[in-house]
Amino acid sequence: MKVYFYHTQNIQYCLRRMAEGEFPSHFLYGACHLADNGVDVVYHRSPKHELSRLKTALYTAWRVLTCRERFDAIYATHYKGLELVVLLRALGLFRKPIVVWHHQPIVKSKSRLRELLGRFFYKGFDRLIFFSQKLVDDSLKAPKADPRKLVVGHWGADLAFYDKIKAELKAEQTSPSHHLTTTPPQHLTTSPSFIATGKEQRDQPTLIEAFNRTGRHLILYIGINPNPNVPNPNLEAVERCKPADNIDVVKICGLLPYEIAREVAKADCVVICCHRTRYTAGLTTVVEALALGLPIICSRNPQIPVDFDRLGCGISVEYGDVEGWQRAVEYISTHPEEARRMGNRGREIAEQMFNDERCAKEVAEVIKEFSL
């Protein structure tokens, strides 16, 4: 069996950096391991330049409909850009099944017309894969959600990629040149370091206020757009909060999973402070921290499929709770052995449930349902 794999990101860029050892495979949602599970892959040729949503949909439809390689189904990380093909499937004009990851719960539209259009559009999907059971449960409240089409997938990190990074750092730390040239900053020698990455729905004011009060060392990565005409709300929120000297703000531009993962691996704890959302904001950071064996402090998002407190791999904090964040940070800082146990437990969870190979196996099982 063979699938046409569609991604909203540039697939060729991802594959090229993967070949260079600088990109984790989980950003391709198990596609790299589908062949190991009996499903071959035709990779979508991403456009060389960013297009408008309509032009992207037209380009994608053209690529799919004119593909010279035979394929049996479409597997996609998102329906954005795939809309025209989905509509053709709903109309019965495209005969191949479509399997898509759905990042938010399906909801009923307040507009009767939009709801009717949505119900028709969703007929074009054969399976929708969700990141958690909570997303499925919330989706089932919407009339257009067909329970026969909804499944839960365990999306997780490329463990080999993070093991390689940890091995690189260990080798660098034991090399003679490292001991001769490296002098750790003073605050790193007296206190554990916390690190915050990611950009979606981040609650910077709560996080910064908590660390301003604790005085603990925080490395805060902020993604920015180099175009001065494009606003950078995350950076603006950070600057308004006036971070204290114990907070290092690092501006980054572009997709840098390898470079950031190296810095995360050096930290003692990963912190994920988010606003209330209807989806799994912060999940990418969660699965990477689990893979690296680091304890996690995270906003209590019921959409995320990891119960940090129950599983013993971290601490959950209510949304906007500055004092709760203070307590969690202090607990990790003053209980290093427990923090290490949390990290080790997180790695076990990654190996058991949240890894790219398991993700690929589950996706392959869904796709093979249409092989008969």
Task: List the model feature ranges, each with a label.
Residues 126-140, 145-164, 168, 173, ...:
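Donor nucleotide-sugar binding/catalytic pocket of nucleotide-sugar-dependent glycosyltransferases
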Residues 49, 97-112, 127:
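A short, histidine- and acid-enriched strand-loop-helix "catalytic/donor-clamping" loop
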Residues 65-69, 109-128:
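Membrane-proximal helix-turn-helix segments that form the acceptor-binding/catalytic region
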Residues 327, 331, 338-353, 362-365:
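A short, well-ordered alpha-helix in the C-terminal region of glycosyltransferases
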Residues 264-279, 294:
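Acidic donor-binding loop of glycosyltransferase active sites
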Residues 191, 222, 230-264:
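Nucleotide-activated donor-binding/catalytic signature segment of Leloir-type glycosyltransferases, i.e.
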Residues 185-202, 207-221:
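Conserved donor-binding/catalytic core segment of Leloir-type glycosyltransferases
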Residues 310-322, 329-337:
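Conserved acidic donor-binding segment of nucleotide-sugar-dependent glycosyltransferases
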